């Protein structure tokens, strides 16, 4: 038998198996820095250095590696490792972290060959590595800074990572940088037989057809295969439905039932190893009767259309359906029809936006084990308690959901795409059935085909204004294709409707929204949560009105921009922190200098769920081992909320970073603080953390005064204006400056005071009521707060996007290192949405692979200037911070369209935009490949 020998990190290794180098490094050598993002050579997360050249591990085999020198992050010199850790942390290059080891290796290969690379050389070196979080700019800066450190021109600032001064507004080195850069931080797929010696593997056989009757499932040959533990079907599931809010998603399609999309699971095969698993899946025979699918909104609305769902369960109620309308919303205020009839100028157009894929770098994965009287799931998702609820429902444990324990590990990006269960419930089902640890991991293609996308929209918008350009009214109908299952159709549709009005001052609106079931892949949450679609349409119409009035696009927005004390179109009074006009002023000069080839757009985005729904932030702080340990079941999916929570504690108590840590994010150890969605964690959970930190601070001050502090947990709650202990005793704050960063009264020796409180616990719940949609009030409060933004896009002489100026009102900037990367990443994601990204379907079947999604690469990015506006007057909640994660993705797409409209006079109402230099290429990925 042939053997293959090569060197990995200086050590000779030998194998008799010709396999992917990626799999050998991960499975045989357990080098977890080498990530499996696609296994098709498209993403770069598995990049290693082979004989000095950055190479994707998934396209190299052990046979081809014969005699070669292979280097991973683990094999870099100590000096190189420290340089990259410091540099990536100092500039904010690390968000979800899944792409980072691959980026480091591409950077290390470059720096070893060229110790002083230019920005263009770095862009070129990492063009094969995809990052979906940062927009690449911070990674480029990080590689250049690492090179400067290794040349001896820059020194590592050890104080920055140590974080002795770690409060709000300070440059905070993220808490997870080191483990993500060096690759030892664990995502679910990094769990293996070393963690669970009895681990087995599960994978679903999925439908070949978007709509077909399942006539017969024959798994007998698969079950007879040695190494197969069993094959689970619908009859093995206590409750064969899951769903985030609406339970309409079948766990498995049973014999006699009809599939709804090609991602539907027919059965789950469980085997001792992955080779046996894949062989067994091929042995499962499924007989179908193919049926005509419902391809789009028009077909879904047809009178003779097949009804995709006859009913669903929502909040414990059975809802019967008689058409394909999954959800609908009607948002109205004033009299839009009359206002438009009396307007000096009115414009109407129909807009179309596509499905788009989240393309997070980490495919879905879960590991489940039998645990106590139920199961424990190690998961990558956006809400541990949401997953617990869905999985408990599947088991029929609605009254005892604690039998399901969910622990969130590192999450390799989400952007809304990990709010629904995917692999978690399948792993749990198999673990409970076979009493074994089970790993269920999606391939990249399964991920693309299965998880919910951004909703495709078809909408008609009518906007009017008076002779001076003041908006008078908006009428629109928004139609969403929600695909085969509801996912978060209702909330996303609602947000699209409530934000379709924009951040302006007019009061006549009539907005109808409908979400239709089709046989396409489901659509659900995606960064922007429906607002990207509706504000694209609105902001394009605003430019048309400016032309009719005879004023500039900047001027018409400034005349209508919301200010503190004024009413938004939904009636909510803009609070003191509102700074939309300031964002417009921030880009005014650059826009006016380039007005004939520039585009402008504004946006607003809520923080928190709002609209009268329960949306509490919860946090506990326990003193353990001389540290303040923050417990909150909050998923940090790359946005950096764990770092922000530590900054909140540092600000309130005066503690250094070394005395603060984040505890286990699980439903067993931490309280429910809601989904990482709706730009809510900085505000909602951040305020809960701050409240708990105040309770801790008070106890620390009592220690310094020589007072005895009872060992019982201290519990309190607040609504942003008042705080009460849970026994209804009012909380008396003798330090009014506490609400403003930089003014807190803290102990003289916080570390010593903390040590005296070992074992003490401080619990806080923050809930600020909001009003329901359509509340009968003159000025209802829909959300705790809004962020605002203005983006200016400039085209070059070749009609390519050359510069983007993104000005944001994000309240208090909690971490200046993090905010720029969030804005830059959002801008680039929105640029892809506008120009290159698509998710083509043929008769409801996805045609995309990761490399054909149109994701922009590092050598295609424009200059991005992230501008943040801080006002003196801020909200008292969470030190005045607001969410930045979603709003950064909203205004860039319409600004790009408006720039092209300025240049050639063509209104483009469909995304991705046609007739641009980008549209001549089928995908950005192919363009990048061709340029090599």
Please provide the spans of the model-predicted regions:
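Signature of N-terminal electron-transfer/Fe-S-associated modules in redox systems
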Residues: 1-161, 611
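Short beta-strand elements
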Residues: 48, 179, 185, 365-370, ...
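Short acidic, glycine/serine/threonine-rich loops at helix termini
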Residues: 85, 107-111, 136-137, 144-145, ...
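Glycine-rich loop/linker segments at domain edges
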Residues: 92, 170, 176-182, 322-366, ...
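Flexible, low-hydrophobicity surface segments
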Residues: 148-321
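C-terminal catalytic domains of large/alpha subunits in multi-subunit enzymes
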Residues: 234-235, 397-403, 433-438, 467, ...
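Helix-loop-helix junctions that connect adjacent transmembrane helices in secondary transporters/permeases
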Residues: 307-395, 560-627, 647, 750, ...
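Thiamine diphosphate
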Residues: 414-435, 439-441, 644-648, 851
């Amino acid at each position: 038998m042939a053997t293959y020998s090569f060197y990995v990190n200086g050590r000779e290794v030998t194998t008799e198996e010709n396999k992917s180098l990626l799999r050998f490094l991960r499975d045989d050598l357990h080098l977890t820095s080498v990530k499996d993002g696609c296994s098709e050579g498209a993403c770069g997360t598995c990049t290693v250095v082979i004989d000095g050249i950055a190479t994707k591990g998934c396209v190299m085999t052990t046979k081809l590696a014969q005699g070669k020198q292979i280097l991973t992050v683990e094999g870099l010199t100590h000096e190189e490792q420290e340089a990259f850790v410091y540099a990536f942390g100092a500039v904010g290059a690390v968000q979800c972290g899944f792409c980072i080891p691959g980026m480091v290796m591409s950077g290390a290969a470059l720096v070893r060959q060229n110790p002083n690379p230019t920005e263009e050389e770095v862009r070129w070196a990492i063009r094969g590595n995809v990052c979906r979080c940062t927009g690449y700019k911070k990674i480029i800066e990080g590689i250049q800074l690492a090179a400067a450190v290794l040349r001896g021109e820059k020194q590592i600032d050890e104080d920055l990572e140590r974080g002795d001064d770690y409060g709000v507004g300070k440059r905070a080195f993220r808490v997870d940088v080191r483990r993500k850069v060096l690759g030892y931080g664990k995502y679910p797929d990094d769990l293996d037989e070393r963690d669970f010696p009895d681990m087995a593997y599960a994978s679903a056989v999925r439908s070949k057809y978007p709509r077909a009757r399942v006539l017969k499932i024959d798994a007998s040959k698969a079950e007879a295969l040695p190494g197969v533990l069993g094959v689970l079907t619908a009859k093995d599931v206590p409750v064969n439905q899951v769903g985030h809010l609406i339970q309409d998603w079948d766990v498995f399609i049973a014999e006699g039932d009809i599939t709804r999309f090609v991602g539907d699971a027919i059965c789950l095969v469980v085997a001792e190893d992955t080779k046996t698993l894949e062989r067994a899946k091929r042995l499962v025979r499924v007989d179908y009767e193919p049926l005509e699918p419902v391809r789009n909104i028009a077909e879904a609305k047809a009178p003779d259309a097949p009804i995709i769902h006859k009913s669903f369960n929502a909040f414990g109620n059975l809802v019967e359906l008689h058409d394909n309308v999954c959800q609908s919303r009607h948002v109205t205020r004033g009299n839009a029809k009359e206002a438009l009839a009396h307007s000096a100028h009115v414009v109407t157009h129909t807009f179309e936006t596509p499905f788009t894929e989240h393309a997070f770098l980490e495919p879905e994965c879960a590991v489940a084990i039998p645990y106590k009287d139920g199961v424990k799931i190690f998961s990558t998702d956006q809400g541990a308690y949401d997953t617990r609820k869905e999985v408990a429902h599947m088991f029929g444990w609605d009254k005892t959901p604690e039998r399901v324990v969910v622990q969130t590990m590192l999450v390799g990006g989400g952007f809304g795409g990990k709010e629904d269960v995917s692999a978690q419930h399948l792993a749990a089902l198999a673990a409970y059935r076979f009493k074994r640890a089970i790993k269920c991991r999606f391939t990249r293609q399964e991920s693309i085909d299965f998880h919910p996308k951004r909703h495709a929209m078809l909408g008609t918008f009518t906007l009017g204004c008076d002779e001076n350009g003041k908006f008078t009214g908006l009428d629109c109908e928004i139609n969403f294709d929600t695909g085969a299952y509801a996912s978060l159709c209702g909330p996303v549709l609602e947000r699209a409707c409530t934000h379709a009005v924009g951040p302006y001052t007019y009061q006549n609106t009539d907005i109808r929204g409908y979400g239709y079931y089709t046989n396409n892949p489901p659509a659900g949450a995606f960064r922007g949560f429906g607002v990207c679609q509706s504000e694209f349409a609105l902001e394009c119409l605003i430019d048309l009105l400016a032309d009719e009035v005879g004023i500039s696009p900047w001027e018409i927005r400034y005349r209508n921009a919301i200010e503190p004390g004024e009413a938004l179109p939904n009636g909510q009074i803009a609070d003191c922190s509102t700074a939309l006009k300031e964002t417009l002023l921030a880009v005014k000069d650059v826009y006016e200098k380039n007005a004939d080839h520039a585009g402008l757009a504004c946006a607003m985005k809520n923080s928190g769920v709002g609209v009268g729904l329960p949306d509490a932030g919860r946090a506990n702080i326990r003193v353990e081992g001389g540290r303040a340990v923050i417990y909150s079941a909050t998923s940090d999916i790359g946005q950096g909320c764990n770092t922000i929570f530590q900054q909140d504690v540092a600000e309130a108590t005066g503690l250094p970073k070394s005395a603060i840590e984040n505890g286990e994010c699980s439903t067993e150890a931490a309280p429910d603080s809601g989904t990482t969605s709706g730009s809510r964690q900085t505000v909602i959970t951040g305020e809960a953390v701050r409240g708990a930190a105040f309770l801790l601070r008070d106890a620390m001050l009592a220690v310094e005064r020589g007072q005895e502090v009872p060992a019982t947990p201290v519990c309190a709650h607040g609504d942003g204006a008042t705080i009460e202990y849970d026994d209804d005793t009012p909380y008396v704050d003798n330090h009014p400056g506490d609400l403003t960063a930089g003014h807190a009264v803290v102990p003289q020796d916080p570390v010593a005071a903390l040590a005296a409180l070992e074992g003490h616990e401080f619990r806080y719940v923050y809930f600020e009521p909001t009003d329901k949609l359509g509340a009968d009030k003159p000025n209802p409060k829909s959300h705790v707060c809004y962020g605002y933004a203005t983006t200016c896009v400039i085209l070059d002489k070749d009609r390519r996007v050359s510069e983007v100026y993104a000005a944001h009102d994000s309240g208090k900037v909690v971490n200046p290192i993090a905010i720029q990367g969030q804005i830059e990443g959002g801008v680039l994601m929105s640029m892809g949405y506008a120009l290159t990204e698509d998710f083509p379907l043929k008769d409801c079947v996805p045609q995309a692979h990761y490399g054909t999604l149109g994701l922009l690469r590092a050598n295609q990015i424009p200059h991005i200037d992230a501008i943040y506006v801080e006002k003196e007057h801020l909200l008292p909640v969470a030190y005045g911070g607001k969410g930045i994660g979603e709003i950064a993705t909203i205004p860039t797409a319409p600004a790009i369209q408006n720039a092209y409209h300025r240049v050639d006079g063509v209104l483009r109402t469909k995304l991705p935009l046609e007739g641009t230099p980008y549209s001549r290429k089928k995908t950005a990925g192919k363009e990048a490949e061709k340029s090599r």
